[in-house]
């Protein structure tokens, strides 16, 4: 009887250890899936995009399982701090302000920002004075407009899709967002124009996009960085990049 009980106890302990190992091997990524080509919902209501493919490649290197969870952009960092998710990969600029709240992986994408409007509506960035410009709420683009262009009215949106629709319908004059994202709109619309040059202010747009991780989780940051180096070395990063942005 003792032998049976001991065997059963060992079995239960082993099962608990195995269950914990499975839980530890799943990395829960939060993202805001209205930001093509980085993250968006496909026709089957599944999250797709550059960030998703990259995260899957990193998880493969770490021998871990990825899961992806759609959240509003301005809730990503709070959700990390409440430990609802392990990481956030959502075209997020690495900035000093964000580094006060979370840690980041090494940069995985170099970024710039751009103003876009309907053709012939806004001549240049100086002409934005007194205009209404759409931005995503909680984004560095919003901070840039408020602090660097106080003469411009910043109009916050929960998603850039909503801002784009309002611009097309004349409710706002321009949209300010990541260059790669607004470039997607030009593929579908022929009446758009860039307003001035790209903006690369490092205070707001950092030193590229990084994967945000809750402070104190240095182990995950190190694993992400090691895996990022690996996928860049083996050519997988380039394959993913070319899939979405071309050579």
Over which residues does each language-model region extend?
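Extracytoplasmic small-molecule ligand-binding "clamshell" domains
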Residues: 22-91, 234
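Periplasmic-binding protein-like
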Residues: 33, 109-116, 186-226, 247
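Extended ligand-binding regions for polar small-molecule ligands
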Residues: 53-61, 127, 131-132, 137-140, ...
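Short helices/loops that flank or line small-molecule/ion binding pockets
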Residues: 60, 69-70, 74-86, 101-103, ...
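Short beta-strand-to-loop elements that line the ligand-binding cleft
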Residues: 65-72, 135, 152-159
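A ligand-binding cleft/hinge motif common to bilobed small-molecule-binding domains
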Residues: 90-100, 147, 173-205
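Flexible hinge/capping segments at coil-to-helix
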Residues: 105, 117-133
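Ligand-binding clefts/hinges and TM-proximal coupling segments of bilobed small-molecule sensing domains
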Residues: 144-157, 193-200, 226-247
